[in-house]
A protein has these predicted regions:
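Conserved alpha-helical substructure of the radical SAM core
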Residues: 2-113, 117-118
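Radical SAM enzyme [4Fe-4S]-AdoMet core and its adjacent flexible, acidic
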Residues: 1, 123-127, 131, 139-245, ...
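Short glycine-enriched, charge-decorated loop/helix-capping segments at active-site entrances
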Residues: 46-50, 135-142
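Short glycine-rich, flexible loops that bind phosphorylated cofactors or substrates
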Residues: 80, 131-132
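Short, charged, surface-exposed secondary-structure boundary motifs
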Residues: 110, 132-136
Length: 267
């Protein structure tokens, strides 16, 4: 499971370009939620009309006005957006690395709208193994639908990334099985983050969750993807513009655990 050299260079350049005042994740990664309207603060929000798709021109303008080399497209199922195929082509065409997160259910139906380029990762969200995933998705067969979407995407030549989300009740053993299963599918990348935004507090439960994430990321088997998970984790788990708390505790723990190892910092 290799980390793209081009993405490594893009992130390194973003790190050099940012000022000391800016947060690494905010300057390296732009989060788009196409099925959610923009809030008054300028961040994507589902507070008003959760399923109102935003115009592709508006989303592309946000990308062009941002310096982030990585664009993570998530929020409410992005494949419900009618222009998603064209939008990803345009974003990748600007030289950005695109991670399109989906539950995978619509991939088979819409895969023909996308192009398998080296800057696009179709990112499948996992909430545990089959039983746990189906329960959290609220429907039987959700996990198998995700696997079928992955199969179709792989046969079509796309790069595949798994976004494994860790819940408070997730057992580390299940995470280990999930990662092992993902690697057996020959995925191109694995990202691990907390589910539902985690917690901004440093209480015992939140700290335990972050420590679980620390341990799970060690199982990825790639320092590059482990570092990338730390970079995008606070954004993709909904923790934007938050005060230091449990996530910071988890990041510090990971840094300390690798203090004596030679590792690559991508952000």
């Amino acid at each position: 499971m290799r980390f793209p050299l081009r993405l490594t260079v893009d992130l390194a350049l973003a790190r050099l370009a940012r000022t000391w005042r800016e947060n690494a994740a905010s300057t390296s990664v732009l989060l788009l939620a196409p099925m959610e309207p923009a809030s008054p603060s300028g961040l994507d929000s589902s507070a008003l009309h959760p399923m109102a798709p935003r115009a592709g021109t508006e989303l592309l303008a946000r990308v062009r006005n941002a310096s982030a080399p990585v664009v993570w497209i998530g929020g409410s199922e992005p494949l419900l957006h009618p222009e998603m195929g064209q939008l990803t082509r345009c974003i990748a065409g600007t030289g950005r690395d695109v991670f399109l997160e989906t539950d995978g259910a619509l991939l088979r139906r819409r895969i023909h709208e996308f192009r398998p380029v080296s800057r696009l990762f179709l990112t499948i969200q996992w909430n545990g193994l089959e039983r746990s995933h189906d329960v959290r998705a609220g429907r039987a067969g959700a996990f198998q639908a995700a696997l079928e979407g992955m199969r179709v995407a792989r046969l079509s030549g796309f790069l595949i990334c798994v976004h494994a989300r860790v819940h408070a009740e997730t057992a580390l053993g299940e995470m280990a099985e999930s990662i092992h299963f993902a690697r057996s599918l020959d995925v191109d990348g694995i990202v691990i983050s907390s589910a539902n935004g985690g917690s901004n507090s440093a209480n015992a439960e939140a700290t335990d969750l972050q420590q679980k994430i620390v341990e799970a990321r060690k199982l990825i088997g790639s320092k590059w993807w482990e570092s990338f998970s730390r970079l995008v984790g606070p954004l993709v788990s909904g923790q934007r513009n938050t005060t230091p708390g449990a996530e910071a505790v988890g990041v510090r723990a990971e840094r300390e655990s690798h203090a004596n190892e030679e590792s690559v910092r991508v952000a």
